[in-house]
Amino acid sequence: MSTVVLRSNGNGSRRRRQRVARRRPAARTQPVVVVASNGPARRGRRRRPVGPRRGRTPRSGGGSRGETFVFSKDSLAGNSSGSITFGPSLSEYPAFQNGVLKAYHEYKITNCVLQFVSEASSTAAGSISYELDPHCKASSLASTINKFTITKTGARSFPAKMINGLEWHPSDEDQFRILYKGNGASSVAGSFKITLRVQLQNPK
């Protein structure tokens, strides 16, 4: 009996390994990018505290009350003269004089708009001068610098600092006065329309 010995040259196993290597895809490695922050990290938004902001006084039920009043002084002649006193002596407006002003201990007028509404003919001549007396001491017009032409409608606004309206006044004390005087004819020239912004406090 003869014995045959088969020798393997190793090519078959190599081919198998190559095939297996081809079938297995190489694992991909993804690079990791790290971003360095140059500035400080952002903080989340803070919630606003519930309640009034600092520096502001919350309103209470017993605080001051603001009102706007409008009235007129009619049938002003071109040569008329007189004064309007604002406070308990405001006889031109009984609703203020004998009404709301008597319901509070203190008041202050913070704005006054004096408007002249013309009713004169276009050919009428003359003007009506006016003067502000913030302390109710003058009894007659002393200056004619400020004036309304009787043929034109015009207005003038007086803020609180001009009419003694920064401080509270007792309800039995007048605050300011406006004096006026015309140099026209005796016929009707127009009327005054007056708007007041008033603060009231300490009800009776």
UniProtKB/Swiss-Prot annotation:
Function in brief: Major capsid protein.
Upper lineage: Viruses, Riboviria, Orthornavirae, Pisuviricota, Pisoniviricetes
Cross-referenced Pfam families: Luteo_coat
Biased composition (Low complexity): 27-41
Similarity-based family: Belongs to the luteoviruses capsid protein family.
Gene3D superfamilies: 2.60.120.20
Chief location: virion
Note in the entry: The N-terminal region like those of many plant virus capsid proteins is highly basic. It has been suggested that these regions may be involved in protein-RNA interaction.
Region (Disordered): 1-74
Compositionally biased intervals (Basic residues): 13-26, 42-57
A GO molecular function held by the record: structural molecule activity
InterPro entries: Luteo_coat, Viral_coat
Organism: Cereal yellow dwarf virus (isolate RPV) (BYDV)
UniProt protein name: Major capsid protein
Sorted UniProt keywords: Capsid protein, T=3 icosahedral capsid protein, Virion
Cellular localisation: Virion
Record field: compositional bias (Polar residues): 1-12
GO CC annotations on file: T=3 icosahedral viral capsid
